[in-house]
């Protein structure tokens, strides 16, 4: 139903719109520079047969053009072949530190990365024992870069649960 309406709107007044487009002034050629005009007039006056040659179609060349068939395929570049032959270097992996979260099956961790459990563990250790768990020790223990460890300790903190004593004596105490 929608296509019928759209077609009707599209074809409405089609002949008048086409006539209007046809009768519009066509864009004219950009004017030539005055020095170029004089040179062109001079060349045409010296060689009048050139003007006819430019306008004439050469049947021999047109027949050659019709016979041309181009079928091209890009050659496989040597860089692509070499890239396909070389295998990626194997990454270095390490085993996770703690296995007390067995529901997360992590077999190996790339060097320079840590799991979420390890991140929370090292943040908590650093918070509880900052003298023992320094950035250098964390860097060596988890095989991380110094700037990453410093950023981790600076911008990430673990949650703290604080229980405030009730101000009101009539508050219900938890059992």
From Swiss-Prot:
Signal sequence bounds: none
Pfam families to which the protein is assigned, alphabetical: UPF0240
Protein keywords: Calmodulin-binding, Disease variant, Host-virus interaction, Lipoprotein, Membrane, Mitochondrion, Myristate, Phosphoprotein, Primary mitochondrial disease
Superkingdom classification of source: Eukaryota
A GO-annotated cellular component: cytosol
GO annotation, biological process: defense response to virus; mitochondrial respiratory chain complex I assembly
Cellular compartments annotated: Mitochondrion; Membrane
UniProt modification remark: Phosphorylated on serine. Prolactin stimulate serine phosphorylation.
Membrane topology: Lipid-anchor
Covalent lipid adducts (N-myristoyl glycine), residues: 2
Self-association and partners: Binds calmodulin. Interacts with NDUFAF3. (Microbial infection) Interacts with the vesicular stomatitis virus matrix protein/M; the interaction inhibits viral propagation.
Disease tied to this entry: Mitochondrial complex I deficiency, nuclear type 15: A form of mitochondrial complex I deficiency, the most common biochemical signature of mitochondrial disorders, a group of highly heterogeneous conditions characterized by defective oxidative phosphorylation, which collectively affects 1 in 5-10000 live births. Clinical disorders have variable severity, ranging from lethal neonatal disease to adult-onset neurodegenerative disorders.
Protein's name in the database: NADH dehydrogenase [ubiquinone] 1 alpha subcomplex assembly factor 4
Species of origin: Homo sapiens (Human)
Lineage, opening ranks: Eukaryota, Metazoa, Chordata, Craniata, Vertebrata
């Amino acid at each position: 139903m929608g296509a019928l309406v759209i077609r009707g709107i599209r074809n409405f007044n089609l002949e008048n719109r086409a006539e209007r487009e046809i009768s519009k002034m066509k864009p004219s050629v950009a004017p030539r520079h005055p020095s170029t005009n004089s040179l062109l007039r001079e060349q045409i006056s010296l060689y009048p047969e050139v003007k006819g040659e430019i306008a004439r179609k050469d049947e021999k060349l047109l027949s050659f053009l019709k016979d041309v068939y181009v079928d091209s395929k890009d050659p496989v570049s040597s860089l692509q072949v070499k890239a396909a032959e070389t295998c990626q270097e194997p990454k270095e992996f390490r085993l996770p530190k703690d296995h007390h979260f067995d529901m997360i099956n992590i077999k190996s961790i790339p060097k320079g990365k840590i799991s979420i459990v390890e991140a929370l563990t090292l943040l908590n250790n650093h918070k509880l024992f900052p003298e023992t768990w320094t950035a250098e020790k964390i860097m060596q223990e988890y095989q991380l870069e110094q700037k990453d460890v410093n950023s981790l300790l600076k911008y990430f903190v673990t949650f703290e649960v604080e229980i405030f004593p009730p101000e009101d004596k009539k508050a219900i105490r938890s059992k």
